[in-house]
Amino acid sequence: MEPVDALKQAIKANDAAAVALALEAHPGLTSRLDEPAPGAAFGQTALLAAVQQTNREMVDVLLRAGANINQKSHWWAGGFHVLDDAWRAPWMASFLIGRGAIPEIHHAVRLEMFEDVRRMLSGNPGLVHARGGDGQLPLHFAQTVTMADFLLDRGADVNARDVDHESTAAQWMVRERPDVARRLMKRGAVTDILMASALSDVDIVTRILDADPAAIRMAVNKTWFPMQDPRAGGSIYIWTLGANKTAPAIAKELGHADVVRVLMDRASAGMRLALACERGDEDLVRQLLAARPAVAATLTADERRRLADAAQDNNTAAVRLMLEAGWPVDARGQHDATPLHWAAYHGNAEMARVLLQHQAPVNVKGDEYNGTPLGWARHGSEHGWHRKTGDYAATIEVLVAAGARGEE
């Protein structure tokens, strides 16, 4: 085992004694502690990994070995500091500051260090526009309405976007800090139908639909939220609301019945059917089909891609219901991938069987990577989101039995 791998495994195991032994056995590692740790996300250092484990003893071992407590991660969009993770435990901020961590304005805002924020901005008003981890601004970190108002009153741009997700503070806050997001809306934050639905604002939802009835089709995907920088990780809505979510799905999930009624009154028959399928509501699917047996023939492009989105979300029940309702089996979604590509990528043998029973093309290409479902299965088994839980052997067996060929 390489020395750096021994250190990596010790940190991953949250074992301070093993970290100390690795550093003692391989003194050369001490000069590399501030470099990106091999295999770590976002250019993370060993010390940042220890902080995320909330392991005081391990932090002290690394500091004694020479790790710089103020070294940020090596991340293109804006490095992360140890204090970015200080919220993980009540004791952590004072512990890290006591060992030399220097708070920046983002940390002071996040930790509600109000007097420190006031002092920093008095000394340098321009700090209200300073960028931190992921290129977020201080306003992105505001946990309370009071802090948000304080920053806005001192020149914070309510619609400024971070670097990695190209998203506003309100978009970051919409689920976990709804009261702050509502305040930002009142103070001029750009609002879309997804945000208004998540925050249960019937008036804004109605106003948006009156101005643009097509807005109801908005979904959390690259079509609606394209990134300007190819390195960007995608809209923060992917994490705060959920990939591929629509306004009706969001309102339903959050229990906003009034918003759901407004949205469903405006939704097309195809959208209503897609939502019923996505929720696995077989009775409602049957009712909708009884009322409109030929609805599948009227699906818009956005509605057709809901099948690919359901496959991307690993929602086998939705895929089955959509196919039974007449969705085209070769609909394409993100990366121009078909549902079978996604089933293969997730190692979902059951979904693959269902799709193939509906004549999904087994050797189809044409996605952004020009790969076949078989190629996606092989890639997913090593790098996929479900590589630890997916049944890739069975999925590949299903594909091969259906005539899948190796990549040419």
Task: Tell what function each PLM region has.
Residues M1-G39, L111-R131, S200-I216, R272, ...:
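N-terminal segments that cap or nucleate solenoid repeat domains
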Residues A18, E57-M58, W91-M92, D116, ...:
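Conserved ankyrin/ankyrin-like repeat signature
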Residues L23-L29, V61-N68, G98-A101, L121-G126, ...:
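Ankyrin repeat domain, specifically the short helix-to-loop turn at the C-terminus of the second helix
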Residues T30-S31, A37, N70, V128-H129, ...:
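Ankyrin-repeat junction/capping positions
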Residues D34, A40, S73-W76, G132, ...:
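Ankyrin repeat boundary/linker residues
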